[in-house]
Amino acid sequence: MTNKLITSNLKNSLIFFGLLFSINLITNAQIKVGSLEELIPYLDDDNVNVKLKPGVYSITVEDVANGKYKKEVKLKNVSKVLLLFEGSNSTYDFTGVTINIETKVLQAFGKYQVHELQIIGNNNVLKNLTMIDDGSVHDAPARRATNIVMDGKNNRIEGFHVTTKGSYPYGYGDAFGKGGKVVIPHRKHSACLIRGESNHLKNSKFIHRSYGHCIFMQAASNPLIEGCYVEGEVRKTDDMLAETSGPAFNVDFMTVWGYKLPKGYMLSTGEAGIRAYNAGETIIDGKEYRRGTSNPTILNCTIKYMRTGVTIAHATGKKYVEGCTAIACENGFSLGSGEAVNCSADCVFGPVYSTTYERDKNYNADITILPASEPYYNGSSSVAYIGGSNHKITLKGGDETVAEGLFIKVGGDKNSIRLMHGNFPHQNDFKAHSFNLNNQTKFPVKLSHKSENVKVKSVGKITDLGVDNNIEQINK
């Protein structure tokens, strides 16, 4: 081969690789847009890197009336979607961006459910968006609404800050209905629904002022929720009973549970902080799936003032919770089975852990009971409620956490506000057998008459009303 030919081949190779490099730069170059109108055409694109100019943007009823938001997704029901991310392998950077969404927008589509933001593509990253529902907490959707819905696979939402408002009735939690049976018809508004395959919610903050779940999972396989903060509101039932007008007053405070709202309990005005369901629908690669939630992982999340902190009892497969904290919730953790590692909760308004069903088994937990974050108002008197079998549970905490009249219950009556007068008997008065409880706190332990073959080591006083329990009082 001549020197001239070698030089020519080398030159052609350099040109070829230069073109490839240039194409790669063009493909991955960040596209900057300055309005929502400019952003929307990129939401169904693959392989784009888009940045919305920092600033405050609004979505109004007038925008809907003018036809600016026409997207919809049909999955069991039709959902109207404001921002629908249909593409794949794309990144959307919302650093410094706030989108104010008028709460009246949730009524502007008529009797359709509304999703403010939904992903149905794959391998996308959405980051650093502030979403605010702008209006009254009482501006309920015409049907129901969700701020964020994640379908598709391998998507990540990171660094979001979401303020959720607009539901009916607001201020009573689930006392007057949550599912099919209701005393007061409700229109819920949840914050974030995770579905699909291996979707990831990371380092996001939710200020929840709505009747509905904050973060929940349906038809989700291998979901990961990491580093999130959830904050709802709570309200004393005594304050509800003091009302002299309004929806609860109009039904004489008769709950969906079949009796008048009891005094002495604290209820969240929302629902669960983090919750998993055993049913649902999702769409991945254009195909619809109907299934439950499997293999959820919850890491380093904090949940405050919600009905439950982390409740994933209805999920299947491996259920793993680590480094999570529940503060001033009605209930801290309910996993059914699975692991809660290095978690913490207070029992200010309810138990740090509660068994969901009598069939629950193989629950391994390490929970530190925190000092009270505010005055105790725990109507159930439960520090923890443990039924089922084959668990290994360790409860830790310093002397400052102990409050008079509260105790760890092993089986028997939960004394829950929702389970009085024989209501939902399948959720109460459980047998408890064949597990280990290591109570390193001074809270007393009460082994009910439905406990059997439970091995207990406890710093706190033990009362044993069961059969063949193995108890050991330990000094600390």
Name every feature range the model reports, one short phrase each.
Residues 40-45, 59-91, 100-127, 136-156, ...:
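Extracellular beta-strand-rich solenoid/capping regions of secreted or surface-exposed proteins
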Residues 27-38, 56:
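Right-handed parallel beta-helix/beta-solenoid
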Residues 81-83, 112-118, 145-149, 180-197, ...:
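Right-handed parallel beta-helix
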Residues 52, 92-94, 121-128, 152, ...:
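All-beta strand scaffolds that present successive hydrophobic residues in beta-strands
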Residues 1-30, 120, 151:
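Bacterial Sec-dependent N-terminal signal peptides
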Residues 61-62, 101-107, 135-142, 166-174, ...:
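Short glycine/acidic-rich loop motifs that flank beta-strands on beta-rich extracellular proteins
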Residues 37-44, 60-65, 79-87, 92, ...:
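Short, T/G/N/S-enriched strand-turn elements that build extracellular solenoid repeat scaffolds
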